[in-house]
């Protein structure tokens, strides 16, 4: 990321002034701009929680890195221009506005914070794309398709947390049982 020089891990959530243990310390992640350009600030407990629970569609690390991707064209606007051809601009923005309205009407399982604006929608939808891709593909197929285009990957087809037993066929494709093939 050309627009990231430093990542700061804070021991707790923090406030706009980057102070923690204050009454208004509710921020768990932030990408700097202006004088703080090139810096990312993350709450270490929130970061750990995001990666320890991959089913809640919430991950501050993913969320803040998506803001960096969004900012690669110079604007944090919910539209990653460097990753999408111009022909996709209007359909993408129309989809964002439609999905934000669904969230506001409680007609969506996308996290409420995504209705804040198109910038946060892109980050929240991306968390969903990486944490619960099969659910996103099932419940929001057009959104999944657009995010797949943006990120150039089909996350719904990635096998995660596969529990292989010794008697199962080996996932390497040899046709042998796992215990007689690739079992470490």
Give, region by region, the residue ranges found by the protein language model.
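Extracellular repeat turn/loop positions enriched in glycine and acidic/polar residues, especially those
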Residues: 173-175
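Active-site recognition of the HExxH zinc-binding catalytic motif
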Residues: 56-73, 123
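Metalloprotease/metallohydrolase-associated module, dominated by Zn2+-dependent proteases
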Residues: 1, 14, 19-55, 75-167, ...
């Amino acid at each position: 990321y050309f627009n990231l020089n430093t990542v700061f891990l804070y021991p707790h959530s923090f406030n706009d002034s980057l102070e923690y243990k204050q009454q208004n310390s509710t921020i768990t992640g932030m990408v700097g701009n202006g004088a703080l350009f090139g810096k990312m600030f993350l709450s270490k407990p929130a970061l750990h929680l995001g990666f320890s629970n991959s089913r809640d569609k919430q991950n501050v690390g993913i969320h803040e890195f998506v803001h960096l991707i969004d900012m690669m064209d110079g604007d944090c606007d919910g539209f990653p221009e460097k990753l999408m051809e111009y022909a996709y601009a209007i359909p993408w923005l129309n989809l964002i506005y439609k999905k934000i309205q669904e969230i506001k009407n409680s007609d969506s399982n996308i996290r409420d914070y995504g209705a804040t604006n198109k910038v946060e929608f892109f980050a929240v939808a991306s968390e969903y794309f990486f944490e619960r891709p099969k659910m996103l593909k099932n419940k929001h197929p057009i959104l999944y398709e657009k995010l797949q285009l943006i990120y150039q990957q089909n996350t719904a087809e990635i096998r995660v947390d596969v529990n292989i037993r010794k008697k199962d066929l080996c996932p390497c494709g040899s046709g042998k049982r796992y215990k007689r093939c690739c079992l470490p």
